[in-house]
Curated annotation (Swiss-Prot):
This is Synaptopodin. Expressed in brain, namely in the olfactory bulb, cerebral cortex, striatum, and hippocampus, but not in the cerebellum. Also expressed in the podocytes of kidney glomeruli. In the hippocampus, mainly expressed in the principal cell layer of the dentate gyrus and Ammon's horn. A motif (PPxY motif) lies at residues 549-552, 568-571. Residues 54-77, 111-243, 280-382, 395-416, 497-520, 539-595, 688-714, 805-912 are annotated as: Disordered. The gene is Synpo.
Length: 929
């Protein structure tokens, strides 16, 4: 391993080419290949895994065949840039071994994104990431479609006999398990399985995954325990678990990419944020593994490399977990343990060797750097730092912004000493690319840079950092060139506020593996200083977040990263999320505000609707009035234009309305003495009608009292009907017109009239009563009449039935008996008649009502014949009905043809017209009522 790592000078050399090596396109191809290999090549599962691992570690397919030293040498070339190593470390930190594979790929990305150690190359490489992302995005889409198809096939025929389906099922199960691991749900089981199996899923870069898991357990346990986990498994064990995690990472990346596809930034973020998310998930897994299964890491304690890594890996913890667990060769781990002497050269070598074989090796240099920087830190401190790093790494995976959260978590998670070491890691994380501690100490900047670069790599793994830089760039948070390095520093600044991140630029320049290695021996001091300086700050701010961070980091790794990927707005949300909670809260708060806006708009709409409803109601009310006015005007016009005969004809032909209008003209005929009124009637008649009606009212009242006393049970039962009839009694002439309508509407018309014949009038009166009520003094009476008639309808119907046959008899008898009274009463009605006709015009309902009462006299007699027939007919009909009926009968003969009811109504109208008995008609109705 050392020999393999010593090629680091090539790493330094390859840093220049690191950008080329870390082509975003290779990353995209790697991801696509990984996804495709996992999803589509069930038969080539192992080969695909190896191929994926190779792509991750080497950024090429060179390491597919060679998982050993040659891939290691290649890997250094790919990952040689310190940024690559950092990223690999970040991958280890954020995600366990599987995430390290991603990290290796990301290391290339970092090199492309962040160039070598300087931000400018990163900027230049970002476009490459964007391009490769487009390709990768397409590949991811294709892989996703394939996986979906495969999943659908597998789901539909779970027990299918086809070999392909079986292979897919196996592959799917494996992937699901890995995915769960990446999510941190099944990491313990996978770790145990990997330990038990001990088979290298992919010789290259698989160890980091298992190592990450041990590191996660190491978090709860002593630093040594996490590293032993990988030793117990051995290189093969680490590779197996790492590969499984890599597969899970690939699955996770696929999912993330699918999620990220939603937003244009997704293309860029898929490579960056997707891998970061997967890494963060692996870190969450490792955390869960640590918490749930710290013993397996203890079991792995035997590996000295892991122990060594953990001692120096407080910064490594996130990444060191990968390095320690993933260090296939214990010597490398030992080198890590010896950060001052061996680590300085070895970190480069180990980073190269580790990156090439494990993909962790690359991160291992970062680990070594961390070890150098942190080797002075006590084992407890290192262990705590590992725990912190794990926590931190998960949040950074979620987002570079969350790196602060992770840093506080680490600081709060371990003791004060641990906080220092974790602070070192935290510093690395906040300054992921900046390596503020390294930068702070210029002599140690290079050395610390590797350690912090490792943490930075973790943030870099949370490529959201670089992505965030692009998006955050508008906010002025980070410059696109130094996005990775400065992003975490900026985030770190927000976290710590105190720390000056000016060094980050130098740290970027110092990231070259060799300088970093040399500095790595010094970095522990610098990092310690930074930790001593910043750890309190980290503790202060993140302490509130410390407890939630693991879950929060997991949540962030799964969701917040996706949100970042989804849109710059999410980044803006993340901008405040430099404090992990605030960013998350902001993301949530914004939707809440939007929801409130929607509710407000809905409320406004509701109020508008209510207003419209109010408008509608008033409209409904005036319509009846308008109808009444129109009816009255039409009646007046008809009265003027049409003669009595025409009036009679109309009711038969037209119906109730026509008869009503004709009745008004009949009233005019009655009022024929007042020709002026005919001219006046439309308006003046309206005014006069109330006067005239007022005169008849008292008469109807008397008649009503009589009718109630003498009349049928219906009238006696309800005096209100009698009152209505009294009001309507004025319109007896119009009632004559009612017969035809009564035929059509016998019930309503009949019942409306108190008198048996009044039903006709009632029908007319209700139709016109509104106008009469509106225009006439009757108005209250008419209004009462309207509702009451509806109630009285059945009763009036009865009188109408009774009145049908008796109408003729009572009409004749009453005509004779009433002849004497009619002249006298007629005189007064005639005197009033001039006005009355106008009133009829205005209040056709009243005259109508009046008319039917005259015929109604026979009706009450009819109804009363059944009930009180003899007395009622004799008393009431003789008074007024006889003349009305005699006159009505002659003209009403047509109405008679219609029916006895029709006969009744025409009688009053005719009697009033022919004999000028309008007064008689009025009198009979009044007398009858």
């Amino acid at each position: 391993m050392l020999g393999a790592h010593f090629p680091p000078p090539p790493l330094g050399a390859s840093e220049g080419r690191a950008a080329p090596c870390t082509f975003q396109i290779p990353d995209g191809s790697y991801r696509c290949l990984a996804l495709e290999a996992e999803e589509s090549s069930s038969e080539d599962g192992l080969q695909g895994e190896v191929r994926l691992v190779d792509l991750e570690e080497e950024g090429t397919s060179q390491s597919r065949a060679n998982h050993g030293t040659p891939p290691l040498s290649r890997a250094p070339a790919i990952i040689q840039p310190s940024s690559c190593h950092r990223e690999a470390r970040g991958g280890f930190q954020r995600s366990d071994r599987p995430s390290h594979d991603w990290d290796v790929v990301q290391a290339r990305k970092v090199m492309t994104a962040s160039g070598s150690s300087s931000p400018v190359p990163r900027v230049a490489q970002k476009p490459a990431l964007g391009r490769s992302t487009s390709f990768t995005e397409n590949d991811l889409k294709e892989a996703k479609a394939r996986s979906q198809q495969i999943a659908a096939q597998l789901t539909t025929p779970p027990s299918s006999n086809s070999r392909g389906v079986q292979l897919f099922n196996r592959r799917r199960q494996r992937v699901n398990e890995f995915t769960l691991e990446s999510r941190g749900q099944r990491s313990p089981k996978l770790n145990q399985e990997a330990l038990q199996t001990g088979r290298p899923l992919s010789p290259i870069g698989h160890a980091p995954g298992p190592s990450v898991k041990p590191t996660s357990p190491s978090k709860p346990g002593s630093p040594k325990h996490p590293s032993p986990q990988s030793p117990s498994r051995g290189v093969a064990g680490h590779i197996m678990e790492g590969y499984s995690e890599e597969a899970s990472l690939l699955r996770h990346l696929e999912k993330v990419a699918s999620e990220e596809e939603e937003v244009p930034l997704v293309v860029y973020l898929k490579e960056n944020a997707a891998l970061l998310t997967a890494n963060g998930l692996h870190l969450s897994q490792s955390r869960e593994t640590q918490q749930s299964s710290p013993n397996p890491p203890d079991t792995e304690v035997p590996s000295p490399a892991a122990d060594i890594n953990q001692n120096p890996s407080s910064p490594n913890a996130t990444l060191t977990t990968l390095a320690s667990s993933s260090h296939h060769s214990q010597p490398t781990a030992d080198i890590n343990q010896n950060p001052p002497a061996a680590i300085t050269p070895v970190p480069q070598n180990s980073s190269q060797a580790q990156c090439s074989p494990n993909g962790t090796l690359d991160s291992k240099p970062g680990t070594l750097c961390a070890d150098d920087g942190q080797s002075p830190v006590p084992a407890e401190e290192v262990r705590s730092s590992i725990l912190l790093i794990d926590k931190v790494s998960a949040p950074p995976s979620a987002a570079s912004t969350f790196s602060r959260e992770a840093t506080p978590l680490s600081s709060s998670g371990p003791p004060a000493a641990d906080l220092m070491s974790s602070s070192l890691l935290i510093d690395m994380q906040p300054s992921t690319l900046v390596a503020p501690a390294e930068q702070e100490v210029p002599g140690h900047v290079a050395v610390t840079t590797p350690t912090k670069v490792y943490s930075e790599v973790h943030l870099t793994l949370a490529k959201p950092a670089s992505v965030v830089n692009r998006t955050a760039r508008p906010f002025g948070i980070q410059s696109p060139g130094t996005s990775q390095i400065e992003q975490s520093p900026m985030m770190g600044r927000r976290q710590f506020g105190e720390k000056a991140w000016a060094p980050p630029a130098s740290s970027m320049a110092d990231r070259s593996p060799q300088p970093q290695r040399h500095i790595m021996s010094r970095s522990p001091m610098v990092e310690r200083r930074l930790l001593g300086q910043r750890s309190p700050v980290l503790e202060r701010r993140p302490l509130g977040n410390f407890t939630p961070p693991p879950t929060y980091a997991e949540t962030l790794s799964t969701a917040p990263v996706a949100s970042r990927v989804r849109s710059p707005p999410s980044y803006s949300t993340l901008y405040p999320s430099s404090d992990p909670k605030p960013s998350h809260l902001k993301g949530q708060v914004a939707p809440a505000n939007k929801t409130g806006i929607l509710e407000e708009s809905m409320a406004r709409r509701g109020s508008r609707k209510s207003m419209f409803t109010f408008v509608e109601k008033p409209k409904v009310t005036p319509n009846p009035d308008l109808l009444d006015l129109v009816q009255t005007a039409d009646e007046k016009r008809r009265q003027r234009d049409h003669g009595e005969v025409g009036m009679e004809e109309e009711p038969f032909a037209l119906g109730a309305e026509a008869s009503n209008f004709q009745q008004e003209p009949i009233a005019r005929d009655r009022a024929s003495p007042a020709a002026a009124e005919e001219a006046v009637p439309e308006w003046a008649s309206c005014l006069k009608s109330p006067r005239i009606q007022a005169k008849p009212k008292p008469k109807p009242n008397q008649n009503l009292s009589e009718a109630s006393g003498k009349g049928a049970e219906l009238y006696a039962r309800r005096q209100s009907r009698m009152e209505k009839y009294v009001i309507e009694s004025s319109g007896h002439a119009e009632l004559a017109r009612c017969p035809s309508p009564t035929m059509s509407l016998p019930s309503s018309w009949k019942y409306t009239t108190n008198a048996p014949g009044g039903f006709r009038v009632a029908s007319l009166s209700p139709a016109r009563t509104p106008p009469a009520s509106l225009y006439h003094g009757y108005l209250p009476e008419n209004g009462v009449l309207r509702p009451e008639p509806t109630k009285q309808q059945p009763y009036q119907m009865r009188p109408s039935l009774y009145a049908l046959s008796p109408v003729k008899e009572p009409a004749k008898a009453s005509s004779r008996a009433t002849s004497s009274r009619t002249p006298s009463r007629t005189v007064s009605p005639r005197a009033a008649s001039p006005a009355k006709p106008s009133s009829l015009d205005l209040v056709p309902n009243l005259p109508r009502a009046g008319l039917p009462p005259s015929p109604a006299l026979p009706r009450p007699s009819r109804s009363s014949p059944g009930l009180y027939t003899a007395p009622v007919q004799d008393s009431l009909q003789p008074t007024a009905v006889s003349p009305t009926y005699s006159s009505d009968i002659s003209p009403v003969s047509p109405s008679r043809a219609w029916s006895p009811r029709a006969k009744q109504a025409p009688r009053p109208s005719f009697s009033t017209r022919n004999a000028g008995i309008e007064a008689q008609v009025w009198k009979p109705s009044f007398c009858f009522k």
